[in-house]
Curated annotation (Swiss-Prot):
InterPro entries: Etherase_MurQ (IPR005488), Glucokinase_regulatory_CS (IPR005486), MURQ/GCKR (IPR040190), SIS_dom (IPR001347), SIS_dom_sf (IPR046348). HAMAP family: MurQ. This is N-acetylmuramic acid 6-phosphate etherase. Gene3D superfamilies: Glucose-6-phosphate isomerase like protein, domain 1. The lineage of its organism: Bacteria, Pseudomonadati, Bacteroidota, Bacteroidia, Bacteroidales.
Length: 281
């Protein structure tokens, strides 16, 4: 496999996400008109995500049993897509009290690319798989590629190698029948249409990607027992706001006075452990 893929001026499929905007002469519009136009387009995103729910469900139901056996999720993307994967992965430890090694976001160009573009990083077809092997990836894990275009070589190369090694692959893309979807066991195609600013996939595509990532990780964590009722009982107590929130969860569950509930929480380090310990006597 070549380390860099050659770019072609003749795409093999139509990139809906890069078609001309439905709006023109943007620079002549008032601020209010621009905001209302963007909001109008954003309303299409939730509908596109709703249509993708059957595929999202298929992916989640395949992920959960793997994670119960010690599997992990790897997000892979470049640019905005990569940053969103890293963002979602980084929220799992504080929200659900899980180790940061459980859901891992990888971005073309590494951590430097979180803030600054790294030239040609997304065109490397082998680096993604190299990064996965550095994490000792195995067949209990899941690789989810994220790319609005569905053509990012860094992602496609990693997914292709993952499938060859019997690893479950999924993807999130804004175009149908993309090369990336062809490498996914379960592709999620979220067709949001052309962007307000032509080709600016950080807009509707990015919004939809974030929504789907939220849906995947939240539903997986609920299935893994990290939520009780509707509460984040395993959240990390990383600041006073969260200590207060956890204390009030305990009050609601056990009917204790505030100070006693807070002391119980701080003693055990999590809402769930505090409640379980109190009920156990």
């Amino acid at each position: 496999m070549n380390s860099n893929i050659e770019k072609s001026d003749k795409p093999s499929f139509i990139k809906i996400s890069e078609q001309p905007s439905l709006y023109d002469d943007l620079e002549k519009k008032s601020v209010r008109e621009i905001l209302e136009d963007i909001n109008k387009e954003d309303q299409k995103v939730a509908i596109a995500v709703q249509k993708a729910i059957p595929q999202i469900e298929k992916l989640v139901t395949q992920i959960v049993p793997r994670m119960k056996q010690g599997g992990r999720i790897f997000y892979m993307g470049a640019g905005t897509s990569g940053r969103l994967g890293v963002l979602d992965a980084s929220e799992i430890p504080p929200t659900f009290g899980m180790p940061p090694t459980l859901i891992i976001g990888l971005i073309a160009g590494g951590d430097t690319a979180l803030r600054n573009p790294v030239e040609n990083a997304e065109d490397n077809t082998i680096r993604g798989w190299e990064e996965l092997t550095e994490h000792n990836i195995n067949d209990k894990d899941t690789v989810i590629g994220i790319a609005a275009s569905g053509t990012t070589p860094y992602v496609i190369g990693a997914m292709h190698a993952a499938r060859e090694h019997g690893i479950l692959t999924g993807c999130i893309t804004s175009n149908p029948n993309s090369p990336m979807a062809a490498e996914a066991d379960i592709p999620i195609e979220m067709i949001v249409g052309p962007e307000y600013v032509t080709g600016s996939s950080r807009m509707k595509s990015g919004t939809g990607q974030k929504m789907i990532l939220n849906m995947i990780t939240t539903s997986v964590m609920i299935q893994l027992g990290r939520v009780k009722g509707n509460k984040m009982v395993n959240m990390q107590l990383s600041n006073r706001k969260l200590v207060d929130r956890g204390t009030r969860m305990i009050i609601e569950e056990l009917g204790l006075e505030y100070d006693k509930a807070k002391a119980l929480l701080l003693m055990h380090g999590s809402v769930k452990k505090a409640i379980d310990a109190y009920k156990a006597g």
